Amino acid sequence: LTERPNAQAFFYEGSTYREFGILMVHGFGGSPAELRPLGLHFAERGYTVDCPLLPRHGGPPSEMRGAKWQEWVEAAAKSLHELRQSCSKVLVCGLSMGGLVTLQLARRQAEFGQIDGIVLMGTPVALRNRLAGLARLAKHVVSDFGPLDRADFRQPHVQKFVLRNAPPDAVIDFSDKQVIAAIRKQARIPLDAVDQLLQLNKLAVRELPHVRVPALIAQGRHDHVVSPHSAQAIYERIGSTDKQLLWLPHSAHVLPLEPDHAELFAAVRQFVGQVAG
């Protein structure tokens, strides 16, 4: 899990629709790799696409120690500002925690710049892992927690998660106890970083009624990280009058890489057309 394939930021200058910019924001502990297929989809159709690597991401989870949620928002805001220099319209797509960052950008447009629409994918209002809810208290007792500590490595979705974060040519023996122990150790996340995620989550929930840009909210029915109730809660609380809720019946958490990705891409394409006018 130390080497992260395709973790680097990516930027594609548009052609046919070069003045329509799409900013993509990855998730907590993730990297631009999880959004690259969606980015390529729109780059191939002539749109300008930018996906920054958020601070303290792209390497092992231990590098997230000491992170502040403001760093993540400011990094995305910088990319938004740069897109605005050449694009007359900008759509922001956020995956998981990236959706929380997206909501902050949409809420603070006077500070960060105009946004013409947002796409929220698997955005966490309600987390499935109850340990995360104890982060603010537990961080004073222990320094980190392991999301894979109790994972069953025989389960396909667990193996899929591990392989996504491994080098492309990695061969992993999921029956080897020493290999599993090493994976669990490397996957441990600093609790102070989880606390920052929860702070950002709390702020986003509180400010949802003040977000009024057109919004597409997408959620996988088989999400093992974020409760599907999150999508419904966002849809009901967000201040946008132009809003859509897309359920993906065969998808888990990282929507651009899930079985329903073609349906997601088509929905975002249609939404882009609506925003473009």
Question: Could you describe each region identified by the protein language model?
Answer:
Residues M97, V101-Q104, R108-A187:
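Alpha/beta-hydrolase-fold enzymes
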Residues Q244-G277:
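Catalytic active-site module of serine/aspartate enzymes centered on a nucleophile-bearing elbow/loop
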Residues A7, P190-E207:
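Active-site nucleophile elbow and catalytic-triad environment of alpha/beta-hydrolase enzymes
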Residues V211, I217-Q219, D223:
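Short beta-strand/loop motif that positions the catalytic acidic residue
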Residues P60-L91:
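Catalytic nucleophile-loop/oxyanion-hole region of alpha/beta-hydrolase
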Residues G29-G39:
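The serine-hydrolase catalytic nucleophile loop
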Residues H224-S230:
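Conserved alpha/beta-hydrolase "acid-adjacent" motif
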Residues F42-P61:
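Conserved alpha/beta-hydrolase
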